[in-house]
């Protein structure tokens, strides 16, 4: 914009200014409407748009900049029980989903394994232990984790795993999984570590 204004100020004849706008994105109006509706729906279904597409990325940024200031925030569905809570945060078709897990003191969650899901756990508050056991082995592997020392623990397929809160307060874990949860095909199999 400042380049355009500069040309207006420096031109002796303002009617002869011609500038080419780049980049040019070719897209149908109906596709733009679909994108705008998807942006609106993303606050409920948590699906982020494909940021690899330059036009989608720019349109999403523009969409957010036009939200009323009282609409910058939106609630998430917390699945709460006596053990703590599990809340889905972000989903993408290309890169899986991110969730927030809160575990009460002394609670162990998990004791399951996956065929195709791999996960990354990051404890950001509290202290705990993540345990693994290959499904065809008796050897148990332990990683002690803490919000005081941020480190990612990969959860590979074929390992039953759990996470236990060893602290006196809630433990908060950011969890990434490589695919969006599908209730019809959960790929989650109970097996104690």
Task: Locate predicted features.
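Mid/C-terminal beta-alpha module of Rossmann-like enzyme folds, strongest
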Residues: 1-76
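Structural signal for conserved beta-strand scaffold positions within catalytic alpha/beta enzyme cores
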Residues: 19-21, 75, 88, 100, ...
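A short glycine-rich, His/Asp/Glu-containing loop-to-beta-strand
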Residues: 72-111
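Short beta-strand His + acidic residue motifs that chelate non-heme Fe in jelly-roll/DSBH
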Residues: 86, 110-112, 130-132, 152-155, ...
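A short beta-loop-beta micro-motif enriched in histidine and acidic residues
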Residues: 95, 107-120, 147-149
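Glycine- and acidic-residue-biased ligand/ion/polar-headgroup-sensing regions
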Residues: 116-135
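Short acidic-glycine-tyrosine-enriched beta hairpin
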Residues: 134-158, 164, 172
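Double-stranded beta-helix
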Residues: 137-139, 166-193
């Amino acid at each position: 914009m400042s380049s355009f204004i500069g040309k207006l100020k420096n031109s002796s004849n303002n009617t002869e200014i011609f500038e080419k706008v780049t980049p040019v994105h070719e897209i149908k109006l109906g596709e733009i409407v679909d994108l705008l509706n998807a942006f609106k729906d993303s606050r409920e279904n948590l699906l982020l748009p494909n940021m690899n597409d330059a036009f989608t990325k720019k349109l999403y940024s523009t969409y957010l900049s036009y939200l009323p200031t009282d609409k910058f925030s939106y609630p998430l569905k917390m699945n709460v029980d006596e053990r703590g809570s599990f809340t889905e945060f972000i989903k993408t078709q290309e890169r899986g989903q991110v969730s927030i897990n809160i575990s009460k003191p002394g609670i162990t969650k998990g004791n399951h394994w996956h065929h195709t899901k791999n996960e990354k756990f990051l404890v950001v508050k509290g202290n705990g232990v993540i345990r693994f056991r290959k499904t065809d082995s008796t050897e148990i592997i332990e990683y002690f984790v803490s919000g005081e020392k941020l480190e990612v623990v990969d959860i590979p397929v074929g390992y039953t795993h759990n996470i236990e809160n060893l602290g006196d307060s809630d433990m908060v874990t950011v969890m990434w999984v490589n695919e969006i949860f599908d209730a019809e095909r959960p790929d989650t199999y109970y097996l104690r570590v």
